[in-house]
Curated annotation (Swiss-Prot):
SMART domains: IG
Residues carrying sugar: 93, 125, 131-132, 138, 142, 146-149, 152-153
Coiled coil spans: none
PTM description: O-glycosylated with sialylated oligosaccharides.
Taxonomic lineage from the root: Eukaryota, Metazoa, Chordata, Craniata, Vertebrata
Protein purpose: Receptor which may mediate L-selectin-dependent lymphocyte rollings. Binds SELL in a calcium dependent manner. Binds lymphocyte.
The species this protein was found in: Bos taurus (Bovine)
Protein's name according to its UniProt entry: CMRF35-like molecule 9
Disulfide links within the chain: 37-104
TM region positions: 171-191
Gene Ontology biological-process annotations: immune system process; signal transduction
Length: 255
């Protein structure tokens, strides 16, 4: 059981403290918005990307655009700045179809480091084509800076309440692994129990057969002993006279 707990800790604890609500950015149709994501020093040489978050239970990427590339007909670009440990995502000519959740991530071995971002797009108006969105909504060019001294995953900066969301697979993977290990352990224990029970039943059956053979042998010896006299000779059985006849002895007449 102890190895299972250790494995569970290795899978869950590294990203457990980063599971919080996503940050929202917004803009009007036709606007250009940008956001910046920071990363730790050890992730400087890793590839950065921007993608649309898909999947209901397990998060996955669609329409991925890597650093130095342009996607969606040039409307999306990702520019990495290793000197400042941050990369910038620029979204041009927004449309209502662009609304949804996105991932700002860094490729690495195992699980990627990602930040979930919700993009809101409002219908454009002729009165203020490039004005700020309604009150209560974050500005289009919001910086999503995140640094951490305890973990390499994205965390909110001190000047912003941006929060980070880790893909649901980070939570489901340890659960599935633990369930698989518990199932394997249970099946092994059940198989061992059934094997021992079968051996005990087989041993009891063999013992019962031996007892029957031994008892039958003793009964045969007792029957044989009843036919012998104390000297070991066979004792003839007494013959009973036939009904209506006298014993079959020779008759002698006196002289």
């Amino acid at each position: 059981m102890r190895p299972l707990l250790m494995l569970w800790g290795c899978l869950v604890l590294p990203g457990y403290g980063s599971v919080v609500n996503p940050k929202e950015i917004s803009g009007f149709e036709g606007d250009t918005v940008s956001l910046q994501c920071t990363y730790e020093e050890e992730l400087k040489k890793h590839q950065k990307y921007w993608c649309r978050e898909a999947g209901l239970f397990i998060s996955r990427c669609t329409g991925t655009v890597f650093s130095g590339e342009y996607g969606q007909e040039g409307r999306v670009s990702v520019h990495d700045n290793p000197r400042e440990n941050r990369f910038t995502v620029i979204l041009r000519n927004l449309t209502l179809k662009d609304r949804g959740k996105y991932l700002c991530g860094v490729k690495r071995l195992g699980f990627d480091k990602t930040m979930s971002v919700s993009l809101l797009v409002f219908p454009g108006t002729s009165l203020h084509p490039a004005t700020s969105p309604p009150a209560g909504i974050s500005q289009p060019a919001t910086q999503l800076d995140s640094t951490s001294t305890e973990d390499t995953s994205f965390v909110p900066s001190s000047s912003s309440k941006s929060r980070v969301s880790i893909p649901l697979i980070r939570i489901l993977a340890p659960v599935l692994v633990l369930l698989a290990l518990l199932l394997a352990t249970g099946l092994a224990a059940l198989g061992n129990y059934m094997f021992q029970r079968r051996e005990k039943a087989q041993l009891a059956s063999e013992t019962q057969k031996k007892d029957k053979v031994h008892l039958s042998h003793l009964t045969s010896e007792d029957d044989e002993a009843s036919w012998r006299d104390p000297k070991g000779d066979m004792t003839p059985a007494s013959t009973l006279p036939m009904s209506g006849d006298e014993p079959g002895f020779s008759k002698f007449s006196s002289v």
